[in-house]
């Protein structure tokens, strides 16, 4: 699955994606939906993912803290 175009999905597609069990899994590039939402400055999607529990499911080393 390639999540790099998650910001172009329509709201109905996004709701379907958020209800799936693959929501917080990494894509073929090793990044999560939260990574792409932050990279594209899509604050609405970032907030939606955070409310859905993205912080509990962060991928190790995806967001290095330094």
UniProtKB/Swiss-Prot annotation:
<keyword id="KW-0244">Early protein</keyword>
<keyword id="KW-0040">ANK repeat</keyword>
<feature type="repeat" description="ANK">
    <location>
        <begin position="29"/>
        <end position="58"/>
    </location>
</feature>
<comment type="similarity">
    <text>Belongs to the orthopoxvirus OPG039 family.</text>
</comment>
<dbReference type="InterPro" id="IPR036770">
    <property type="entry name" value="Ankyrin_rpt-contain_sf"/>
</dbReference>
<dbReference type="InterPro" id="IPR002110">
    <property type="entry name" value="Ankyrin_rpt"/>
</dbReference>
<protein>
    <recommendedName>
        <fullName>Truncated interferon antagonist OPG039</fullName>
    </recommendedName>
</protein>
């Amino acid at each position: 699955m390639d999540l790099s175009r998650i910001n172009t999905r329509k709201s109905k597609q996004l709701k379907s994606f958020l209800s799936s069990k693959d929501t917080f899994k990494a894509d073929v590039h090793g990044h999560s939906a939260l990574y792409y939402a932050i990279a594209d400055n899509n604050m609405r999607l970032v907030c939606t993912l955070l409310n859905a529990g993205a912080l509990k499911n962060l991928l190790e080393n995806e967001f290095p803290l330094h």
